[in-house]
């Protein structure tokens, strides 16, 4: 379960916070008992791609926790000052060393229990030269039947890949929205 009461100390003065509903609000917030600062917590955006070369999809084997050693699509946390598309391209370059051309937003997945929103773009690889970064053990292309389904790191990756291959079989790609438990 997601811990909604994570802010223990004020980011302004360092004093202890208390959770209560501020005036003119409808949700509990962390409020500083000393300076009155109200702290808002919002979901984090995870951005990534489904990089494709012909009939193959590029996956990365994680060199970091959580889920060390398991396979994932190239993705990571969006940074301030970038768009979701820019973040997806950056993460693909950082994790796989891959150059891509985005082809449109593909999945938007709400992962409420961990306070995240995952956005994956379809992407075309510009070549097959990969240079995995420090967060990746290896980057490898897989045909659908070769995907290590039992070794995927995250449910959002599984959902995205399943929807990608289903759409590809139908000959058209749609935007998929879902809530992941």
Please provide the spans of the model-predicted regions.
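Unchanged
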Residues: 78-163, 167, 172-173, 181
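Short connector loops at helix/strand junctions that flank enzyme active sites
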Residues: 27, 44-46, 52, 66-68, ...
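Active-site donor-binding loop signature of nucleotide-sugar glycosyltransferases
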Residues: 34, 62, 75, 123, ...
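Conserved hydrophobic/aromatic beta-strand scaffold that supports enzyme active sites
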Residues: 9, 29, 50, 59, ...
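Conserved Nudix-box catalytic region and its N-terminal flanking loop in Nudix hydrolases
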Residues: 52-94
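Nucleotide phosphate-binding site architecture
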Residues: 11, 18-19, 33, 58, ...
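Acidic, metal-coordinating catalytic segment for phosphate/diphosphate chemistry
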Residues: 2-49
